[in-house]
Amino acid sequence: GKTFHEGDWLSIDGSTGKIYDGAIPTVDASIGGEFGRVMGWADQYRRLKVRTNADTPHDAAQARKFGAEGIGLCRTEHMFFEGDRIAAIREMICSDTVEQREAALAILEPMQQSDFEGIYEAMEGCPVTIRFLDPPLHEFVPTEEADIEKLASDMGKTVAEIKNIIAGLHEFNPMMGHRGCRLAVTYPEIAAMQTRAVIK
């Protein structure tokens, strides 16, 4: 056998489970051949429509390519983990006032709007079901010391203050806790921003 280390490339055949050393050339999946023919027959008689889970314009375009007839669930929280967005959502979470939260959300709104526009374009008029921010806020706050220090510095707070905020977000059962519509009740400015981004 061989020992792999962090940063080493390996490839896995999803059908057989076989592992290959290094990055091997791949081809994009397609619906063709005998499978495509059988699916075409099924399309002639089916009444059920197939929708996809897609959270980005790229995922939506891929889903349409494979025949999805809409998006059954677009999870907006996945949009917040990319690039500069996570910094803005963390600032929003650690803000002391509605005005500070709205300032952070103003950074996120055009990004969300752009994502929704891309998704709508990719879906070519097919229905899209969008779920507003759902997970508990503790999922967005930093856990690494360096990230906590950076957030404290960016917000003009002490590390202790940020750690207190993070500790305050901990829940015994986050699956049943402060999330989803409960978040919208506590922080209506989040739902307002997302509503504007969806509609614009």
Which residues fall in each region the model found?
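Conformationally flexible catalytic loops at phosphate/diphosphate-handling active centers
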Residues: 1-2
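Short, compositionally biased
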Residues: 20-37
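Conserved alpha/beta-domain cores
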Residues: 31-34, 41-200
